[in-house]
Amino acid sequence: MADKKNLLLLFDHPTEPVFMDKGGNGTVFDVPDSYVTDRYNQMCKKVQRRVSSASEKNVQVKEIAIPDLSCSMRLGRSEQFSIFLKSHRKMASHLIEIFTKMQTVDELQSVAVYARDRVNPVLFNYALSVALLHRPDTKDLELPAFAQTFPDRFIDSKMLRSMREESFVVERSAARLPVVSSVKYTASDLDVEHRLWYFREDLGVNLHHWHWHLVYPIEAPDRSIVDKDRRGELFYYMHQQIIARYNAERLSNHMARVQPFNNLDEPIAEGYFPKMDSLVASRAYPPRFDNTRLSDVDRPNNQLRVGIDDMKRWRERIYEAIHQGYVLDTNNEKIVLDDAKGIDILGNIIEASDLTPNSTLYGDFHNMGHILIAYSHDPTNKHLEYAGVMGDASTAMRDPIFYKWHAFIDNMFQEHKRLLSPYEKQELSFPDVRVESIQVESQGQVNRLTTFWQESDVDMSRGLDFVPRGHVLARFTHLQHHEFSYTIKVENSSEATRYGYVRIFLAPKLDDRNAPMLLEQQRLMMVELDKFVVTMPPGSHTITRNSTESSVTIPFERTFRNLDKLEELQNFLCGCGWPQHMLIPKGRPEGLRFELFVMVSNYEEDKVDQTVADCGCSIAASYCGLRDRLYPDRKSMGFPFDRKPRRGSEILENFLTPNMCAVEVIITHEDRTEKLREVPARS
């Protein structure tokens, strides 16, 4: 029986033939002759003998009858794959179906080995990843980070060349020096948007977006892979939180909040020049110049034809449905957009996933927005150019237009939310429970948090093809903060033990004009920091919680990790979650004022009846849910800030009920870099 961990080796060196050595210990797949592509048929055995002599392990591949892969092979090996393109999703869905229907790990390994050299490498990575995440016999595997198999999505072409040079020239991997990523490679300080390079180009932020779309694919052969609990609402909330976090960073850099891209006829003011090469396509990601206008896209090779008028029509129909309070399914039956399920239905319509009740009527709005922008430089394929970074889930967040587009998408969701009745005091209160105070402490300072720059290394060797083996480190500079802890004082004045759900949010106190924020504005900038359950016997209690325990984030080591020490991370199998080092905004050198909000709600009302102890993932559930489980909170995502405030609660102070508390917190940024000192010797 095959060792299922060998399946992970198929992600290594994605453009090299499958019979080449894989993994840190030089594992070789013993590939049947019939599985070798025509190109390598004559030399495969000769190469394998050479490679096998230095390898530590050989993996026998069982020869089986291979299913028809022709659908998934329609996309060329050197073309660009995009989950936003329906034709590409169909190809991926076909391959996912083949992978998930294999009866045993042996059969899965055989068909994956066969497919690997025949289908597009990125499509293969996506399909195998989705299959492994959802097969009962492989869902506990630790998937390699996408950055370590496709480093070209995360570093510029100059750095990629330097890494190849380091790998080729310095034979002994222990003597190789890290290749340092520049912080100024996409634009100069003349570009105001470049102040946010550390957010848009952050490794963990972009990995989060890619991994979220792996866990929540838009389309799949088995509806259960897509139809996860509150999937549409999660699409709304995860992206809403990205915009809230982005706006906090903009305020940290003396910039106005992002303006929604709500007029498709207007030019896109911001250009973007990614400076990245696609290893699969062997060409550069195309730039977008300032003031580029969107055009109808007609690219028959991608079975793609979508126009500005299509987008406007879909938008009007979605807004009409929101204002009417219902959508129509394919049988012309009404589906009510109620308080509980309405946002979930809208999420599946706007994205749009396989779960949309009527794709003919409401279209593919969000996905086609990505596509129109991604092909704005060559909408008719006249110049044979591939899509820009907005066409790829792993690169889209690098582009300033991503945030303007998603700010507009969020406005559509907020239109629905504003039509819902505000929460009244009795819906927000927790009888007999009072939050007396909250404070944060970091480095001995109370209610003061500090951010700074930090260097960290990522081993990207397994994404560098056709170069000598061994570790090749990329060194990134990223935002970091000192750890902090919450101290919450709560009183339970009843005579019974109560169970509370602690909800912690953070939002700027002043707007971009330095004026106090009204709650209707501020609630849209509330960033969720944590959510957890507490037990409160009668009396007074002090609750403490460390920032590293956040329900929003995945551990720092999950982003910056050693490829050969994955056993240390077996408790963090999902990989979906916001990066820990980006938990709080950057702040300013002089300090930026935020309001820290805590609410203790009634867990007996909020809890979902299920067991989560053995779900096999870190509990970064706020943005990603729980694998194979219901979302662990009955309340709407973003509660209590997902609706407009009740009358008389124009500011946060007036919104508070006894089970809530808020305090001012100052975030200060120190413009210094904590450098790594471990430098291998050249010998």
Curated annotation (Swiss-Prot):
Binds 2 copper ions per subunit. It catalyses: 2 L-dopa + O2 = 2 L-dopaquinone + 2 H2O; L-tyrosine + O2 = L-dopaquinone + H2O. Its main location: secreted. Its cofactor is Cu(2+). One of its GO terms (biological process) is dopamine metabolic process. This is Phenoloxidase 3. It is an enzyme of class 1 (oxidoreductase). It is found in: Secreted. The lineage of its organism: Eukaryota, Metazoa, Ecdysozoa, Arthropoda, Hexapoda. The active site is at residue 351. Pfam families: Hemocyanin_C, Hemocyanin_M, Hemocyanin_N. Upon activation, a trypsin type protease cleaves prophenol oxidase to yield the active enzyme. Cu cation A binds at residues 209, 213, 239. One of its GO terms (cellular component) is extracellular region. Keywords: Cleavage on pair of basic residues, Copper, Disulfide bond, Glycoprotein, Melanin biosynthesis, Metal-binding, Monooxygenase, Oxidoreductase, Secreted, Zymogen. The keyword Glycoprotein applies. It comes from the Eukaryota. InterPro entries: Di-copper_centre_dom_sf, Hemocyanin/hexamerin, Hemocyanin/hexamerin_mid_dom, Hemocyanin_C, Hemocyanin_C_sf, Hemocyanin_N, Hemocyanin_N_sf, Ig_E-set. PANTHER family: LARVAL STORAGE PROTEIN/PHENOLOXIDASE (PTHR11511), PHENOLOXIDASE 2-RELATED (PTHR11511:SF4). Its EC number is 1.14.18.1. Glycans are attached at residues 358, 492, 546. This is a copper-containing oxidase that functions in the formation of pigments such as melanins and other polyphenolic compounds. Catalyzes the rate-limiting conversions of tyrosine to DOPA, DOPA to DOPA-quinone and possibly 5,6 dihydroxyindole to indole-5'6 quinone. Disulfide bonds join 574-617, 576-624. It comes from Drosophila melanogaster. Belongs to the tyrosinase family.
